[in-house]
Amino acid sequence: MRHVWKTLLLVTFFFNKGIANDCVPYRIDDDVIACVCNATYCDGLPDGRPEVPEEGNSYWYVTNKQGLRMKMSEVKFDSCENFPVDVTLTIDNTKKYQTIFGFGGAFTDSTGINIAKLSPATQLQLIRAYYDPKEGSRYTLGRIPIGASDFSERQYTYDDTPNDTTLKHFILANEDFDYKLLYARKALEFNSEIRFFSAAWTAPLWMKSNDNGLTFLKEEYYQVYADYLLKFLDEYKNNGIDIWAITTGNEPLTASIFKLPNISMGWEPETMANWIANNLGPTLASSPYNETLIFAFDDNRQVLPRFVEPTFRNQDAKKYVAGTAVHWYQDSKTPADVLDQTHDEFPDKLIFMTEASVIGPPIWNTSKVKLESWHRGERYILSIIEYMNHWSIGWVDWNLALDETGGPNNINNNIDAPIIVNPKTDEFYKQPMYYATKHFSRFVDRGSVRISITDNDTIKSAAFVTPSAENVVVLYNRATSPRHVVLKDVQKGTLCLELSPQSMNTLKYK
């Protein structure tokens, strides 16, 4: 039977300076844990210690299936006497790769709907858990849908008046003011370094063909739709949110396969390239938003690099596009080598992972949340490691928060989320997925550069050097037993670590 441990003594004890606020566990059984947060308490990292340890030491943060959550200790370099070795990994920070831009999640309508059901104090705790650079995950990215997504209670765009080619009736929705803008601005209060990017699920219905339920933008509305997106940038700026980047639209392949005419829109690779070259690109370039980046594609990687080749081989389109946005769905069926191929073919273009979530059981099963699932947290951290090691500049989760059914969703496509909201008790639950992203986002600052580290089938790894010349190493032990790991830094020395079973580990040293 589910029960919550909320001992007040824990709350008092762990507010001591320099000691992390420990997880108050919500348990189903002994090895399945989420962490409970409410208006007065939420686990977080300590705020009374130096950012990096003294020379010769490393901070070591551990989250594991047994219940540790970001548990911090110090380990000394070159203290390996009589240490048994299972795995040796070598770091070389002279071998550098891509620069990291950040990590984040999406301010969907559903996220806002769920946050709004909490008390004001608990709302701030939730936003702090993600965006506070001191105690939270230090997220620096936020994705904002342009109009409705499936994670809205209704299907809408900003101009549903047929044939309004001058966009006279363009207007933001109540959902923008009540949910998206409101909480995006609150996040900015915690961290002014947040950059927001946006994608539309669809153009207004009257701009599209809808033959047999499959939906594409009509060519006569190519410029009107570019103007529509420009108006969105205007309205959000007028309401305090600058948009750093937009994509060419959410999941154009999905709209070419599934009949969801009201909340999807397909593109063919060649027509997308032409629209960028002749409409979207010039429209943004001649506007006050000429520094707003454009990312093409925004879909699953199984058709890369083929889908973006027409865009990047069309010089009139290529000059406007910063890179390729990609989602994680179907990754198990498509090796990450396609990201390397895309990078190798177009090395001057960025790769950016913009959506991940755990969908769970089939679509007709409405119960998609598996509270406290370690396996789902494992999927997250392995995905982040993989994308970092294959040229992505960031990794962005989908909904920041959902309810205990994984909704609301207007097509019954409920899913899981790193934070689950319980308005009845004015609480939210931080799942293992939350800590998986935090093991990266809290330590890998914007401007960090990925560096070389050897890999292993059991111990998955990624390594970075930050703009402050700190080294950050993330390790995941996939084994169900401890592993003794020797971490050799060519410049710094050797760390000897006993990694607990199924554990997430972040090391930080100067």
Segments (PLM) and residue ranges:
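Cleavable N-terminal signal peptides of Sec/SRP-targeted secreted and luminal proteins
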Residues: 2-21
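Short linear sequence signals and composition-biased patches located at protein termini or domain-edge surfaces
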Residues: 3, 182-183, 501-505
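Compositionally biased, intrinsically disordered low-complexity segments enriched
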Residues: 5-8, 246, 504
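Substrate-binding and catalytic surfaces of secreted/luminal carbohydrate-active proteins
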Residues: 21-91, 196-198, 227-234, 239-244, ...
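N-terminal catalytic cores of secreted or lumenal carbohydrate-active enzymes
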Residues: 65-244, 248, 263-270, 274, ...
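Active-site loop signature of alpha/beta-hydrolase-fold enzymes
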Residues: 149, 251, 359
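Short, conserved phosphate-binding/catalytic loop or strand-edge motifs used
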Residues: 249-255
